[in-house]
Amino acid sequence: MLTSGTILLAGSLLSPNPGLIFWTAITFVIVLLILKKIAWGPIIGALEEREKGIQSSIDRAEKAKDEAEAILRKNRELLSKADAESEKIVREGKEYAEKLRTDITEKAHTEAAKMIASAKEEIEQEKRRALDVLRNEVADLAVLGAERIIRESLNADMQKKVVASMIQDMSSKRN
C-alpha cells in the first residue's frame, strides 16, 4: 500500500533540486579524484599492457605469416625442382629404353645375318658335297655303263678318254 509520503518523495526526486545537484556533482568529482589517484594509473597501465600484448600478437602473427609465405615459396620451388627432376628421370628412362631397344634390334639383325650367312655357307658346302658325290656316282655309273658298251668295241685307252671327257663335261655344266 502506498502512502502519500511515498508519492511525495518520488515526485521530489523527479523535480530538480539545486542542493541535490550540487552535492551529487561534488560527490562525483571526489569519486573521480579518488579513482584518478587510486585506480586511474592501474587502469591505464592495464590498458597499455593490453595494447602492447595485442600489438605483440599482431607482430607475431605478421611474422608467422611472412614465415609461412617464405615456406610456401620454398615448397613451391622444391616442388618445381622435383617436377623438373622427375621429368628428367622419365626422359632419360625413355632415352635409355629407346637406346636399349635399338641395340637389341641391331644385335638381333646382326645375329640373324650371321645365322643366314652360316646357313647359306652350310647349304653351299652340302651342295658341293652332294654334287661331288653325285659326280662320283655318275662317273662310276658312266664308267660301268661305258665299260660294258666299250668292252665290246673299245680298248682300255679309249675307255679312259671317254671317262675323262664325261667328267670334264660334268664339271663345266656345274660351273
UniProtKB/Swiss-Prot annotation:
Disulphide connectivity of cysteines: none
Keyword annotations of the record: ATP synthesis, Cell inner membrane, Cell membrane, CF(0), Hydrogen ion transport, Ion transport, Membrane, Transmembrane, Transmembrane helix, Transport
Phosphoprotein listed as a keyword: no
Topology of this chain in the membrane: Single-pass membrane protein
Protein name per its UniProtKB record: ATP synthase subunit b
Transmembrane segments: 20-40
Assembly and binders: F-type ATPases have 2 components, F(1) - the catalytic core - and F(0) - the membrane proton channel. F(1) has five subunits: alpha(3), beta(3), gamma(1), delta(1), epsilon(1). F(0) has four main subunits: a(1), b(2) and c(10-14). The alpha and beta chains form an alternating ring which encloses part of the gamma chain. F(1) is attached to F(0) by a central stalk formed by the gamma and epsilon chains, while a peripheral stalk is formed by the delta and b chains.
GO molecular function: proton-transporting ATP synthase activity, rotational mechanism; proton-transporting ATPase activity, rotational mechanism
Organism, as annotated: Chlorobium chlorochromatii (strain CaD3)
Example of a GO cellular component annotation carried by this entry: plasma membrane
Signal peptide: none
Superkingdom field: Bacteria
Sequence similarity: Belongs to the ATPase B chain family.
Cited InterPro entries: ATP_synth_B-like_membr_sf, ATP_synth_b/b'su_bac/chlpt, ATP_synth_F0_bsu_bac, ATP_synthase_B_chain
Task performed by this protein: F(1)F(0) ATP synthase produces ATP from ADP in the presence of a proton or sodium gradient. F-type ATPases consist of two structural domains, F(1) containing the extramembraneous catalytic core and F(0) containing the membrane proton channel, linked together by a central stalk and a peripheral stalk. During catalysis, ATP synthesis in the catalytic domain of F(1) is coupled via a rotary mechanism of the central stalk subunits to proton translocation. Component of the F(0) channel, it forms part of the peripheral stalk, linking F(1) to F(0).
Cellular location(s): Cell inner membrane
Ion transport recorded as keyword: yes
